[in-house]
A protein has these predicted regions:
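Well-ordered beta-strand positions in beta-sheet-rich domains
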Residues: 30-34, 86-90, 116-120, 135-137
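Structural signal for hydrophobic/aromatic residues that build the beta-strand cores
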Residues: 42, 46, 74, 91, ...
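Hydrophobic ligand-binding cavity/cleft-lining segments
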Residues: 1-69
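Glycine-rich portal/gate segments that line the openings of hydrophobic small-molecule binding cavities
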Residues: 34, 47-113, 173
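Beta-strand/loop substructures that line and gate deep hydrophobic ligand-binding cavities in soluble
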Residues: 104-161
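Short, highly charged C-terminal tails/helix-capping segments
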Residues: 14-16, 164-185
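Short amphipathic alpha-helical segments embedded in low-complexity Lys/Glu-rich regions
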Residues: 59-63, 151-152, 182-184
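A short, structured loop/turn motif at beta-sheet edges
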Residues: 39-40, 67, 93-99, 121-133
Length: 185
């Protein structure tokens, strides 16, 4: 583990896929989640730019404009309880070979200005079974009246909820995939 708490492999993936150049008025961070489900299953959820609500608990609805290609826009409705109701997001990168998705927020009634995120999905072995390492990083402007620490803490809390939900949904699907019908006598 390094000073940030990442393993050498995690650090290498972050260096390779999660390059953000935060300006003076921005904060940036990366979070890691180990999921006990195969990479193809986790990626099948993450890559769905058109259906983030499959695992993101704060999304109630999503409408996509475009053909799910770079530059496509999605209008996301946010569930009540958060300081926003809508977010407009642009697909920046969708790489099915490297398993990388990047999204930029371009509008909405929230304070996340110049928000950009990258999520990468990597195969690993957990307890002798196929598992997945998920890394999500972001950069965002620090809103007027807030500190970098406050802003990072808020965004990290949202991402942690999303990653926990991604793990829950993926692991539930993985168990269903592994469950074989028992032969009746």
């Amino acid at each position: 583990m390094n000073a940030n708490g990442f393993s050498s492999l995690e650090t290498e993936y972050i260096r390779k896929h999660h390059r953000h150049q935060p300006a003076e008025n921005q904060c940036s961070s990366a979070l890691v989640k180990h999921i006990k489900a195969p990479v193809h299953l986790v990626w099948s959820l993450v890559r769905r730019f058109d259906q983030p609500q499959k695992y993101k608990p704060f999304v109630s609805r999503c409408v996509v404009r475009g053909n799910l290609e770079i530059g496509s826009l999605r209008e996301v409705d946010v569930k009540s309880g958060l300081p926003a109701t809508t977010s407009t997001e642009r697909l920046e990168l969708l790489d099915d070979e490297e398993h990388i998705l990047s999204v930029r927020i371009v509008g909405g009634d929230h304070r996340l200005r110049n928000y950009s995120s990258i999520i990468s999905v990597h195969p690993e072995v957990i307890d002798g079974r196929p598992g997945t390492l998920v890394i999500e990083s972001f950069v965002v402007d620090v809103p007027e009246g807030n500190t970098k620490d406050e802003t990072c803490y808020f965004v990290e809390a949202l991402i942690k909820c999303n990653l926990k939900s991604l793990a829950d949904v993926s692991e539930r699907l993985a168990v269903q995939d592994r469950t074989e019908p028992i032969d009746q006598m």
